[in-house]
């Protein structure tokens, strides 16, 4: 049986981490693509040389030509420029949109059957543009955001309650930006919803609000500490979880940026929602009930994403 082929577009910090994780999990053979000559080849060789120590079998190929991604089962896109301190994800729009146009053309030509996971920021606008540029069906193109945002929320909650991260579930909806909507009501510790834990005296509403805000600022906090780049371990782990659910048809319920066709009152836009990811890509979009306040927050988040998509059309009218 032929191994799966995983193509990584962009061989920076996230790309290298993705390649290593794909190897460790034996998800398939890996092609690292980058426009910088030597970078994907060097990282691929370095990771391949770790395989005898870690005990995994996979081929790693570095490439500077899109032809190398031909026939990929999964394509994960990290190409583009990362944030620097003081920048919002939205500041990257113009530069990274041009990158998405090139990446989309490469995928369209060489990997039209692939399941595509976009990580490039500003995420919701970039995955929307990438789907249009590539011409792939919407259920085969997603943005990695909600898994990461939920993971941050879960980690902060596990710290607050001094419990295992495995017993914390968390729910984050909306765009991958300052307007994301972490939902306390749908987040639990061992099945107990957060509002009940407040009543039980485990935490206070004020502390919970601070954790929710820290989740929104999670990426910026790391950018501020690193000063020369942005997060890469957690984003890579999150994208690999989505890829694994697709490749193994696990049907995991995962929050990703998916194209909506009327759910939550949104059409033809990519927004973070809970989905079922299996062998057909996005197999189901789960529409949960939102109260008035949550709906208002979600609508505000959607409006922010819509503004970015409009800005994209201003730069690249072909996206209309």
UniProtKB/Swiss-Prot annotation:
Active site: 176
GO molecular function: L-lactate dehydrogenase activity; L-malate dehydrogenase (NAD+) activity
Matches recorded under SUPFAM superfamilies: LDH C-terminal domain-like, NAD(P)-binding Rossmann-fold domains
DNA-binding is among the record's keywords: no
Binding site for substrate: 83, 89, 121, 152
UniProt-listed Enzyme Commission number(s): 1.1.1.37
CDD domains (UniProt xref): LDH-like_MDH
Catalysed transformations (reactions): (S)-malate + NAD(+) = oxaloacetate + NADH + H(+)
Positions annotated to bind NAD(+): 10-15, 34, 96, 119-121
PANTHER family in UniProt: L-2-HYDROXYCARBOXYLATE DEHYDROGENASE (NAD(P)(+)), L-LACTATE DEHYDROGENASE
Purpose of the protein: Catalyzes the reversible oxidation of malate to oxaloacetate.
NCBIfam families linked: MalateDH_bact, PRK06223.1
Similarity remark: Belongs to the LDH/MDH superfamily. MDH type 3 family.
Protein name: Malate dehydrogenase
Organism: Brucella canis (strain ATCC 23365 / NCTC 10854 / RM-666)
Organism ancestry: Bacteria, Pseudomonadati, Pseudomonadota, Alphaproteobacteria, Hyphomicrobiales
The gene coding this protein: mdh
């Amino acid at each position: 049986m032929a191994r799966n082929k995983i193509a990584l577009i962009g061989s920076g910090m996230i790309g290298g981490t993705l390649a290593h994780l794909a190897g460790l999990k034996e998800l398939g053979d890996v092609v690292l693509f980058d426009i910088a000559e030597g970078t994907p080849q060097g990282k691929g060789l370095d990771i391949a040389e770790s395989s005898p120590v870690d005990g995994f079998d996979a081929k790693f190929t570095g490439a500077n030509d899109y032809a190398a991604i031909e026939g990929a089962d999964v394509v994960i896109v990290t190409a583009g420029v990362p944030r620097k301190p003081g920048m919002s994800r939205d500041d990257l729009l113009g530069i990274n949109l041009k990158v998405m146009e090139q990446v989309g053309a490469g995928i369209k030509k060489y990997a039209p059957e692939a399941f595509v996971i976009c990580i490039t920021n500003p995420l919701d606008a970039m995955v929307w543009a990438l789907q249009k540029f590539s011409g792939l069906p919407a259920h085969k193109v997603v943005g990695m955001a909600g898994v990461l945002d939920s993971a941050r929320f879960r980690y902060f909650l596990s710290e607050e309650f001094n419990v295992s991260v495995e017993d914390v579930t968390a729910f984050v909806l909306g765009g991958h930006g300052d307007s994301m909507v972490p939902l306390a009501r749908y987040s639990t510790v061992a099945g107990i919803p957060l509002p009940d834990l407040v009543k039980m005296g485990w935490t206070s509403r004020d502390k919970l609000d601070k954790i929710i805000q820290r989740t929104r600022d999670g990426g910026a906090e790391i950018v501020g500490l690193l000063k020369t780049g942005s997060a890469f371990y957690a984003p890579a782990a999150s994208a690999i979880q989505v890829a694994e659910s697709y490749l193994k048809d696990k049907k995991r319920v995962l929050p990703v940026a998916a194209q909506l066709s009327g759910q939550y009152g949104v059409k033809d836009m990519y927004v973070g929602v809970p989905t079922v990811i299996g062998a057909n890509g996005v197999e189901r979009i789960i529409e949960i009930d939102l109260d008035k306040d949550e709906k208002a927050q979600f609508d505000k988040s959607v409006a922010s994403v819509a503004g970015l998509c409009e800005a994209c059309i201003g730069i690249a009218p072909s996206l209309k």
